[in-house]
Amino acid sequence: MANSTAELEELLMQRSLTDPQLQAAAAAAADFRILPDATVIKIGGQSVIDRGRAAVYPLVDEIVAARKNHKLLIGTGAGTRARHLYSIAAGLGLPAGVLAQLGSSVADQNAAMLGQLLAKHGIPVVGGAGLSAVPLSLAEVNAVVFSGMPPYKLWMRPAAEGVIPPYRTDAGCFLLAEQFGCKQMIFVKDEDGLYTANPKTSKDATFIPRISVDEMKAKGLHDSILEFPVLDLLQSAQHVREVQVVNGLVPGNLTRALAGEHVGTIITAS
């Protein structure tokens, strides 16, 4: 196994990138977190932003207050408008990559709206090449807003079935948290967390405060509260090994979760 940068470089020059020894050497390389003190918050599109002023304004107030003590990367979901676009595009026979572009445009719109509400506090909206300015914005105002859709667009990996993009805004926000090495990932939804069934339609649904990815899959809950690819991403992540899902419609929940409290459902990698 390589014990130095020089040895790792030698392996990179000599071996296939899938070579087991090279893979082991790369895995043993020193780990580095870019933004270890930051938290990524994903604001749901359909669950929060689509509800309008009544849901969004209280969250804006919480975010403004929370950024005094926390560094926040605030990602936006797409929501109902994206679902409408998906239905039209799928009916036209268009592929997942095109649907991903359409969904991204809606998440962008939501980021723009949230950004305008936070503009007077100096909190910017960043995206694309602008993500390189995130550390500066966090240093100055402790928060940024970004569109949650990952930028795969036409390069979106096809779903196993159908043409709905499998990696959407939940995945995009999680991937940003993982790549930046953030300390926490919070999904802000319109439910208290994960249930044994859909609480909107089943009166027998039972709340689950904590669960692992494997337990979710075993119970058939892997495509319920989060996009199912997020669970696989969580299991393969190095830095973010658990996420919390909270009800953003309850005042104070986000603030408590940022402070490290167990507010909703915590989903663990193992």
UniProtKB/Swiss-Prot annotation:
Disulfide bridge positions per record: none
What up-regulates or down-regulates this gene?
Requires molybdenum.
Respond yes or no to whether keyword Metal-binding is given for this record: yes
Which key words are in the record?
A: Cytoplasm, Metal-binding, Molybdenum, Storage protein
Any one Pfam family here would be AA_kinase
On subunit structure and binding partners, the annotation says: Octamer consisting of 4 alpha and 4 beta chains.
This one is known as Molybdenum storage protein subunit beta
Organism of origin is Azotobacter vinelandii (strain DJ / ATCC BAA-1303)
| This protein's encoding gene | mosB
